[in-house]
């Protein structure tokens, strides 16, 4: 956000799941539509077909952050997106070994927009990091299938817990955009979020941190994309710099926890969460 502001970039924020709000927010100086789907940490799903149609009608590129799904589970370019970005540090590598990213688009976009930049900044990772990332890609489809299978099992388990108010995971039938997720993703991915019950914000926050502190298998970190399961409190970490009122408006409450479900046995993951929920 600070880097964006230093370049004088203006940003309009809109509800991800409301295409009409996107259309209303477009101004004469709008240069692109940018989204992450599913979103972090709410797992809201953006309608890529509808938004790509809107972008084409307005002559604006649609840029999609596909970090959560990776190409194994979702292919935005095939759904009409113009540009796709990935954090290769996350699931593309999958084992927390390298830092990297990827920008994908048409040959025309690469030639006209990317090539002038990479000519001076460099277009590649170091040879070793590139090799490690290439080895990680060899297992991408297998890993993402297991991540998704485990995450769905954990999400269903959490839905049955009396301490939990709501579970947010696109592959659950209770997710408000379950049908849309099914239409554009191959599986639900690794990341879910859940909201704990509590009398007020302070009670919810205390309950959330009791869960975090009680876990032993899950790593306590804002990072994700590893084979290991991780847990974090978004209101204190990833979204801690947002004003509290802004967090409440978008639905990131003090009782929300985000879990990036790893490749461990799902029974072990649930047992660790049960330990945390027990306080």
Label each region the model flagged.
Residues 94, 125-129, 183-187, 249-254:
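Short, flexible turn/loop "capping" segments at secondary-structure junctions
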Residues 42-43, 71, 202, 206, ...:
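Residues that form or flank phosphate/diphosphate-binding pockets in enzymes
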Residues 98-100, 187-191, 254-258:
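Short, solvent-exposed beta-strand edge segments and adjacent coil->beta transition regions
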Residues 152-227, 243-244, 248:
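Conserved small-domain helix->loop->beta segment predominantly found in fold-type I
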Residues 7-12, 28, 229-279:
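PLP-dependent enzyme catalytic core of the Aspartate aminotransferase-like
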Residues 132-142, 189-201, 258-262:
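Short, well-ordered beta-strand elements within core beta-sheets of diverse protein domains
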Residues 113-114, 207-211, 269-273:
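Hydrophobic side chains in well-ordered alpha-helices
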């Amino acid at each position: 956000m600070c880097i964006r502001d230093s370049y004088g970039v203006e940003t309009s924020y809109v509800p991800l799941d409301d295409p009409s709000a996107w259309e209303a927010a477009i101004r004469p100086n709008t240069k692109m539509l940018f989204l992450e789907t599913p979103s972090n940490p709410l797992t809201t799903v953006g309608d890529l077909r509808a938004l790509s149609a809107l972008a084409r009608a307005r002559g604006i590129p649609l840029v999609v952050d596909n970090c959560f799904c990776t190409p194994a589970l979702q292919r935005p370019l095939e759904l009409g997106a113009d540009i796709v970005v990935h954090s290769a540090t996350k699931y593309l590598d999958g084992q927390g070994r390298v830092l990297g990213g990827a920008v994908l688009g048409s040959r025309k976009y690469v030639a006209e927009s990317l090539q002038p930049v990479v000519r001076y900044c460099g277009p590649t990772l170091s040879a070793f990091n590139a090799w490690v990332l290439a080895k990680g890609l060899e297992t991408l489809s297998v890993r993402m299938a297991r991540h998704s299978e485990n995450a769905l099992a954990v999400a269903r388990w959490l839905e049955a817990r009396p301490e939990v108010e709501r579970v947010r995971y696109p592959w659950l039938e209770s997710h408000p955009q379950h049908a849309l997720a099914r239409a554009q993703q191959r599986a639900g991915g690794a990341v879910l979020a859940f909201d704990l019950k509590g009398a007020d914000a302070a009670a919810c926050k205390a309950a959330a941190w009791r869960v975090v502190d009680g876990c032993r298998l899950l790593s306590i970190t804002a990072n994700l994309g590893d084979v290991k399961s991780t847990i974090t409190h978004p209101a204190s970490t990833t979204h801690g710099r947002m004003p509290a009122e802004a967090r409440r408006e978008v639905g990131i409450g003090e009782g929300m926890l985000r879990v990036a479900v790893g490749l461990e046995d799902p029974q072990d993951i649930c047992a660790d969460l049960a330990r945390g929920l027990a306080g």
